[in-house]
Amino acid sequence: MGRLFGTDGVRGIANTELTCELAMKIGRAAAMVLTDGNRRHPRFVLGKDTRLSSDMLEGALVAGLCSVGAEVVLLGVISTPAVAYLVGKYKADAGIMISASHNPYEFNGIKIFSGDGYKLPDALEDQIEAMVLSDVQSPTLASGSAVGKVISAETAVKDYVEHLKSTVPYSLEGMKVAVDCSNGSASATAEKLFTELGAECHILNDQPDGVNVNEDCGSTHMESLMEYVKKHGLDVGVAFDGDADRCLAVDNEGKLVDGDYIMAICALDMKERGKLARNAVVGTIMTNMGFQKFCEEHNMRFAATKVGDRYVLEEMLLEEYNFGGEQSGHIIFRDFATTGDGQLTAIQLLCLLRRRQAKLSSLSTLMERYPQIMINVKVSAEGKLAFYTDHTIKAEIEKAKTELGTEGRIIVRVSGTEPLIRIMAEGKDLEQINRVGTKVADIIRERLMKK
């Protein structure tokens, strides 16, 4: 798999790249590195999404953790941000989530959180990875009464939902909301959350069967939700991904409201209420240029990081900001959470609409979005490596940047979670960015597809 840890934990095709043997080793190494041998029975909370392979990997992780004396608290099917929250709630040393987020069901992944609920920094991931690859953990295997045990957390869903409810001061009674659970982790919590907050819920795609997670539904396939909201005359629609750390929305007219729009709406509201720390918002290099102009117009500072909510969070912690996110819907309300949380984002947005007595369609006009295209080019692991040294590709990218000038931009990057080269072109002239982006994609295919 190359380097084990990408931008969002370990990820790969289950039982091919991400095997039970590897998962067991990761469990052992995580327990040893994160507790540094200071506790006889360190406690780990362990959650999973709805993929067919999640049960298998759960068993392997449990075996690895218990074999070095860790106590494992099983949370069952639950969201990634729930794991991050419950680490602290249950006074655990660390948390682990089994999920491949927005990827198809055949993929799976392992995300690790420290005791304070934050994703691990690169340095700790490197330590775990080194231990896994060198296999040095076997001499420290526990025996006798030192072997770890497993506990089931029967109230995990309730505890997490109560936490989310505590973040909103208003009832959502009377609001008509469609909720697309993506046949993923939100299937375990969304209906309970929105119903208890008083909303009239239309719960969609909440029947996971192990293989239908993210399948033509959720935040990566918004078309059916857009149609549903418009057809049924609802106030808003919200959609999550497989592990519910993302949220995208649909307004009352059936139009898509992506992460940049959600951030613009929420950031301005927070600023006007004196709740936006240092009047600043953190985004990424992929954040739409229209959002950056929006921040300038409203005297808000904008900070851009590398792609990945972990990097957004790092900047927030470094500069003591409390709000940031990504166009993809990873949005971090740091006053309430340590990571992106789709369901938290949804109820914060709905609460804002209730407080302002506004329709989402009217608030979406606050920001003018620049035309933007995204092209994904599938490549092998070797192709991803070759991308960095291919001078022909680099020359074509530089040519594209020159053509777009100051009125647009192009970003070409290797995906940290999938076997893809991602191309984003943006500017005022849609025809131009389509032409420029397509040319770069064609060159990448020509140069890397055979690698």
What residues fall within each predicted segment?
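An N-terminal, well-structured beta->alpha segment
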Residues: 1-63, 67-68, 146, 150-177, ...
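Gly/Ser/Thr-enriched, mixed-charge loops and adjacent short helices
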Residues: 13, 108-230
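N-terminal small/polar loop signature for handling phosphorylated ligands or for N-terminal nucleophile
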Residues: 32, 40-108, 192-250
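Short glycine-rich phosphate-binding loop at a beta-alpha junction
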Residues: 39-49, 73, 176-179, 279-285, ...
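Gly/Ser/Thr-rich active-site loops/lids in small-molecule metabolic enzymes
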Residues: 121, 203-204, 255-274, 342-351, ...
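Proline/glycine-rich low-complexity loops and linkers
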Residues: 126-161, 166, 252-325, 332
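Phosphate-binding and adjacent anionic-ligand microenvironments
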Residues: 236, 273-451
